[in-house]
Amino acid sequence: MAPLTRRLPLLVAMTLVGGEMAAQGGPDAWRPQTVPLFGASYSPDIGLLLGVGVVHTRYGFRALPPSTQLLAEAAYATGANTYRIDVAGEFRRPLLPTILYVEMRASGLEFTRFYGVGNTTVGSQPDSAYRVRQTQLLVAPRVAIPLTSRLRFTVGPLLKYAHTPGDPGTVLATTGPYYGAGDFGQVGVRAGLELDTRDHTAAPARGVHLSMVGQGYPAVWDAVHPFGSVSAEASTYLSAGDPPSATLALRAGGAAVSGTVPFQELVYVGGGTTVRGYAEQRFAGRRGAYGNVELRLLAGRLPFGDVGIFGLADVGRVWIPAESSDRWHAAAGGGLWLAWQHRRVNTLSIAAARSPERTAIYVRIGFMF
């Protein structure tokens, strides 16, 4: 399973602006709109991630949601010293009620660390020993078939290409060779099922989010044997008060791979999307699991927005056949959040997570989940 993506949350959240303007009505509300986007986030291994983009929205005849949305964004990470470029499209009109999505990406941010394979790998060497300079290219069209208003099935082909140099002195170079290093291309198919009843995506207070994704790759291009992966994730949100004064957020997820898998497609746990307080891609295995809990409290309502605090606890691990380990890697911490102009879609969160390996700071739009 490839590492979870790191799209700039601010750029994604701001695509809602066009729909909100149309909902307000007015003579120009339904005209095509092009909106500039700006975003930033911070995590220890990526550094300061700065992004710019643009979203173009077109509507049917006085109808929501938009018939077409086109998004282009580019981001640069100061810590990883690399970039990410995304171009995406959402097309509703040609295939109603089916939705066509097209995603293309060129990125050096998808895979930045490698510590070896297993649940007990050590991280005591200098940071440079674990760095990976991998560039990934992705082309991924898919169709989404609504089964209900909140449940949808997606399916489509995948084309991936990765270039990974084996820099001297790194774990990747000294403990290899690893299948998938160098230049590696793969072609496959992805299918997913998603249930989403959340009231907001950036800062949910109520609802559930369930997703299951399977990927399969035949022995085509550089893949010498077929391989595949399956992953699942579930989150739920329980709140008191309206607007919420306290929210308990829970999430659990896991993944497994089968077949002869290139090293970048293993299951990875650690970092800002799974277990905070650990480095990105800290632990690699053929199976993995993680869990997260956050308690988010409203501290006060100020003229410019709502402010609050939250506590967090993360846990996760991986499994490989040749290793017998019963250790779960855990981290705990807390942080502050601000909902600008009292709107949850404008939520900024700052989190500090402490693990046995380090204390890490994360700044992002919205919450981790």
Regions inferred by a protein language model and the residue ranges of each:
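Short Gly/Pro-enriched loop/turn and capping motifs at secondary-structure junctions
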Residues: 300, 315-320, 339-343, 355-358
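Bacterial N-terminal signal peptides that target proteins for export
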Residues: 1-9
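N-terminal signal peptide c-region/cleavage motif recognized by signal peptidases
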Residues: 18-20
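A short alpha/beta connector and helix-capping loop motif
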Residues: 324-336
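Hydrophobic, well-ordered secondary-structure elements that form the walls
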Residues: 293, 314, 336, 350, ...
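Gram-negative bacterial Sec-dependent N-terminal signal peptides
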Residues: 10-16
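Gram-negative/organellar outer-membrane beta-barrel architecture
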Residues: 25-185, 284-285, 345-349, 353-369
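C-terminal outer-membrane beta-barrel translocator/porin domains of Gram-negative envelope proteins
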Residues: 25-28, 36-40, 86-90, 105-109, ...
